[in-house]
């Protein structure tokens, strides 16, 4: 599995702000989108381009445009929605597919409770977005769904990742590409990434309980 921890100074600075315990919902949302934009830049560096001729202000100009497969962005509900605009800011024509996953309390297995994929998903590059890669169970399930739908080129962008989750995904799906702003220390006894970001979904949607 191709794993890239993007150590750009801007990402490191913004990630430090995201980790603050006293961060506001507004600032968390904005920073999450900004880091996502920077990850998107890296995750799309290998997209093919072709030459095309356009009419410029001083005559015809040879420029380039992206060619090849089109992209579908796949946010995992609910926290993945907080990264969506960060990708769309750079790829505004991308189609959006949505996956909702939850753990079945009886079997402890991850199940899909919502799936809305674009009709031609099999012919697109699928870019999964989710702020946290913790245990890896949800991400493995999401990739399972996309592969069952015919996807061949699957890329994942997460803000922070735990080594345990990376290992699980790599075992199940060694052919995907993973981009993250940070590979953190690991999981605590409650399954949270340390140092992590806390509950990214709660922080994005403003549902953090105050003492």
From Swiss-Prot:
Regulation: Allosterically activated by GTP.
MF terms (GO), sorted A to Z: GTP binding; magnesium ion binding; uracil phosphoribosyltransferase activity
Residues reported to bind 5-phospho-alpha-D-ribose 1-diphosphate: 78, 103, 130-138, 199
Keywords assigned by UniProt, alphabetized: Allosteric enzyme, Glycosyltransferase, GTP-binding, Magnesium, Nucleotide-binding, Transferase
Disulfide-linked positions: none
One BP annotation, GO: UMP salvage
UniProt EC number: 2.4.2.9
Needed co-factor(s): Mg(2+)
Pathway(s) of this molecule: Pyrimidine metabolism; UMP biosynthesis via salvage pathway; UMP from uracil: step 1/1
Free-text remark on how the cofactor is bound: Binds 1 Mg(2+) ion per subunit. The magnesium is bound as Mg-PRPP.
Binding residue positions for uracil: 193, 198-200
Annotated function: Catalyzes the conversion of uracil and 5-phospho-alpha-D-ribose 1-diphosphate (PRPP) to UMP and diphosphate.
Stated name of the protein: Uracil phosphoribosyltransferase
Provenance organism: Acinetobacter baumannii (strain ATCC 17978 / DSM 105126 / CIP 53.77 / LMG 1025 / NCDC KC755 / 5377)
Gene name of this polypeptide: upp
